[in-house]
């Protein structure tokens, strides 16, 4: 599972609180069996099946988009 969130270049936090809230809701619905990973740029391995990946993009004037 992956959450990709996008916001304008001036947003200070990454990942956003909304992205973390989405991950919390998903994890709770699935019995709290998952863990979150942010920034996999230093890993060269398969994703753990019990992992919720969170990616953040900051740029331009994007008001806020979240994809699951």
Question: How would you name each of these model-derived features?
Answer:
Residues 2-68:
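C-terminal substrate-binding/catalytic lobe of Rossmann-fold NAD(P)-dependent oxidoreductases
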